[in-house]
Amino acid sequence: MSEPLLQIKNLQKKYPIYGPLGKMFPPVNHMRAVADVSLELHEGETYGLVGESGCGKSTTGRSILGLVKPDSGEILYKGKDLTKLSDAQFRPLRADLQMVFQDTLSSLNPRSRIGQLLEEPMIIQNIGTPEERRQKVLDILTMVGLSEEHYFRYPHELSGGQVQRLGIARAMIINPKLIICDEPVSALDVSIQSQILNMLTRLQKGRNLSLLFISHDIGVVRYISHRIGVMYLGTLVEEADTEELFTNTLHPYTQALFASVPDFERKERKVSLTGELPQYTDQFKGCVFHTRCPYATDKCRECAPAMKEVCPGHRVACHRVEG
């Protein structure tokens, strides 16, 4: 396999927890939002990052673009560590790295017309003449299933599905290599979700795009992804090619996550979650899942399992699984 387009190595991000008097005193603890996450994304590949809300998947995605500054770890894009770059050094790479947000409408200037919103990234990157930029905007509108008449409209005049198409168009207008899709279809109904996913797949194949697709929806992630990473409490607990993960699910949390989806054709291995979701702070010990895992042992409560490869491309962090 070719060299990865993107490599994340041992990414860490914590947020301070302050006492009753707030920031007058040092933090009393730290919440681990992302804990030692490592993954790779190849050219033309879709990597699905799935997990419950608050598991750190969005923080991981935003760290790639510098929207969140990690505490430690490496984010290598074409071998260059993005965490070590200044704003001036990062700026030329922004054309390669784009994002589609869950709430696209709130990320757009409501006073700008759609044509202006799509031209703006090209102006910032000094791409083309005014006429060339206008033509490219019209082309991208057609490509994402909007019409030329939308050029003069405002974002609030669009439906939910059209707004997401606009978000994808804005991300693609300067021909990026990697797009981070953060819950891009979660607010849409199922029929519109299908249209957006099919469009993303078509555009990806046509442009050899790499996608980091972040979602809490197992079905959506399975549909669009070549490989999937499962996150729980800031930790990557299992990773495999899509079909391998769904036919050979190993981590108890992944099994429970899959079992929560109705009619999933996996009735033979159902794991129900018990216990409370813990606070993943600096004082937390052991496996992140031990408070809710039906198979937890003393070893699980004392020692965090290392991520190990159980077969080519399939990694899992669980003491029960032999490497």
Predicted regions and their residues:
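Short catalytic/signature loops enriched in Gly
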Residues: P4, I17-F25, H30, D241-G323
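Helix-to-loop junction immediately C-terminal to a conserved catalytic motif
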Residues: L65
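Conserved ABC transporter NBD signature motif
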Residues: G73-D81
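Conserved ABC ATPase "signature" region
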Residues: D81, E131-E149, F258
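Conserved ABC ATPase signature
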Residues: Y154-L158, Q162
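A short, proline-enriched helix->beta-strand linker immediately N-terminal to the Walker B motif
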Residues: I173-K177
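P-loop NTP-binding/switch modules centered on Walker-like glycine-rich loops
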Residues: I180, P184, L188, I192-E268
